[in-house]
Amino acid sequence: MPNSTPQSQLIRVHVFVTGRVQGVGFRYSTVDTASQLGLTGWVRNLPDGRVEAVFEGARDIVEEMVRWCHAGPPAAVVQDVAVEYEEPEGLRGFEVKRLVN
């Protein structure tokens, strides 16, 4: 449960996934997987073909989600996952955000 982890043990990662990751269901698979794991955050496509996402939750669960990003859904071909650690903001829910222009 996302609310069962003390705030001090929560982490936030900002990831950028490179490869064939648009048009293959990456965003919606990310929402499903992150929601099943009890993470909060968001995911969106970028104009340069990458997928950007933010995950907040317990360290071990967030790290599991980052590992999932290295493979993605079956049709994806992931070349790289860049990970930046940030301060948690206390996000609620998990959503697909609109494309950045």
From Swiss-Prot:
Keywords annotated in UniProt: Hydrolase
Active-site residues per Swiss-Prot or TrEMBL entry: 27, 45
EC number(s) reported in the record: 3.6.1.7
Enzyme class: hydrolase
Record-annotated Acylphosphatase-like domain positions: 12-98
GO MF assignments: acylphosphatase activity
Family the UniProt entry places it in: Belongs to the acylphosphatase family.
Protein name: Acylphosphatase
Gene (UniProt): acyP
